[in-house]
Amino acid sequence: MRMTTGQALVKFLDNQYVSFDGKEEKFVDGIFTIFGHGIVVGLGEALYENPGELKVYQGRNEQGMAHVSTAFAKQNNRRKIIACSSSVGPGAANMVTAAATATVNNIPLLLLPGDSFATRQPDPVLQQIEQSYNLGITTNDAFKPVCKYWDRINRPEQLMSAMINAMRVLTDPAETGAVCIALPQDVQGEAYDFPEYFFKKRVHRITRPLAVQEEFEEALDIIMNKKKPIIICGGGVRYSEAGEALVDFAEEFNIPICETQAGKSAIKSSHPLNLGGIGVTGNLAANMIAKDTDLVIGVGTRFSDFTTSSKSLFKNPEVDFITVNVSKFHGGKMDAHKIIGDAKVCIEELQAMLEANNYESSYEDEIVNAKKAWKEEMKRLTNIKYDENFEALIKPKREGCIEEFSVLTGGLITQTAALGVIRETIDDDAIVVGAAGSLPGDLQRMWETDARDSYHMEYGYSCMGYEIAATLGAKLAEPEREVYSMVGDGSYLMLHSEMVTAMQEQKKINILLFDNCGFGCINNLQMSNGIGSLATEFRYRDENGKLEGGLIPIDFAKVASGYGLKTYSVKTLAQLKEALEDAKKQKVSTLIDIKVLPKTMTDGYDAWWHVGIAGESEIDGVNKAFENKEKNLKAARRY
């Protein structure tokens, strides 16, 4: 079949399907693009001439549209994607950050950036990078470190092997992440006689591999000698749809479950054995039990530093680790005994073996007591008010900063109380989306939901700017559910362009913007380690040339109203509840500008985080922080 490379690519993508548990569905929903000279007359011509069943989406920022695509794939449990195409140069470079975000989170993302001419005839073309030591290097080489597969199509016939391998990676639960196929602009338009079999319908089967028997037997021997195990529920539980199997396993043997950011909402928050979030951003209950556990069973988790508290959380000297993971790489962390396979079938097999050996944990009232303690703390957090008895959760190191914010903005809302009002007001099955700042910590600790896949957190790359774009991606995946972006003012300012795309697609999203006039989370980290506030609050430059002037007030509601969103500016809890109720009635996207007091986010619960503190300083507070770091490091695992 004679056609251009661009036309062949479109036809190929339109014929890709996946099958999971007997359900077959189309894999590629469409293509996001911001057309430029390096893509519009090649791949762009193909999409105009015959897109097949592929939808063409128009992005506003290349990073933003790629975040939309990542969230779309995540919310579809990695079984549907939207590809992303861009022009050469800056358009391609803008997608590098999004590629890293997808790869870190093991989410399939297909990137199709335009590239400079394969023939080099017109070199240097507009937006081309020239390196004197290698003329073959282009901007697209920057994708290599952040992608799971990378290729460049220098001849039309190379498209075939490249796309077969792209699909191999995108549909492999153990290897998936970002894939970059660089498309030189001249090759996009070159015609070639492609074989018809390249365009046949391809069904990529996502299977449930079962680990070898020896791995189960060795795990059985370990578990039978342990009395107080815990389960860590990671993102792999969600993508395998193994939540029910994991709950059955936990109930059978009375084992408590702790959640990672990616694993949250795979099982019900209300379940008696669900302790909630674990680690640096974990809650009191999970971290209390984790401290004394003698066995950690990690299911579908990659054991990030936040989950393990930089490998210091599990303090029992007899603690061992078992992992159930489809990836050998992630399964081997923490010197764990590996069960390599699908979470659901492996948990079911392990359960049958433990049943046959009459295993049961020896917990008595520890789980109930831990949950009771956290319930009391939750009650306290959601009822913190800015009144005569107010005490900030984070002790302010800058005197008067909370009062200054309140006087300037009129804001009287504490962040933890705001989250309590939001949770009780929005729909039970609403999806919340987050990524960066203090909100992921507050949400992992405080957010409770029994609705499956309703907690959408990107905390692998914790990419500021993901939130609003991802809210649109989640809405495209599940248009019948309300979706809420939980975003700070810092992340909003970094990237909010896809609000316009949401308006264009007529997909209602809700943006809950927590404005505390700064990068509050990093300000806390900075000042808790003995450093003064420097460039983490949004302040004017003062007469001494320093960023020490007054806070910069921003009317975010007014900005968003210019885009056509229904907006609200709230300064009290009563106003917040009223705005949330009204927003539910709207047909268009909404933004609620919530003026939240600084230092009213949650702090940690018996968890340490290893950060690179200066080993020598003239500041006493920094030296004390370094000494504390060294003390904690001695108690942590080395790898």
Curated annotation (Swiss-Prot):
InterPro entries: DHS-like_NAD/FAD-binding_dom (IPR029035), Myo_inos_IolD (IPR030817), THcHDO_hydrolase_firmi (IPR023757), THDP-binding (IPR029061), Thiamin_PyroP_enz_cen_dom (IPR012000), Thiamin_PyroP_enz_TPP-bd_dom (IPR012001), TPP-bd_CS (IPR000399), TPP_enz (IPR045229). Residues 438-518 are annotated as: Thiamine pyrophosphate binding. Thiamine diphosphate binds at E62. Pfam families: TPP_enzyme_C, TPP_enzyme_M, TPP_enzyme_N. It catalyses: 3D-3,5/4-trihydroxycyclohexane-1,2-dione + H2O = 5-deoxy-D-glucuronate + H(+). GO terms for biological process: inositol catabolic process; isoleucine biosynthetic process; L-valine biosynthetic process. Its cofactor is Mg(2+); thiamine diphosphate. Pathway: Polyol metabolism; myo-inositol degradation into acetyl-CoA; acetyl-CoA from myo-inositol: step 3/7. Mg(2+) binds at D489, N516. Belongs to the TPP enzyme family. Involved in the cleavage of the C1-C2 bond of 3D-(3,5/4)-trihydroxycyclohexane-1,2-dione (THcHDO) to yield 5-deoxy-glucuronate (5DG). This is 3D-(3,5/4)-trihydroxycyclohexane-1,2-dione hydrolase. It comes from Clostridium perfringens (strain 13 / Type A). The gene is iolD.
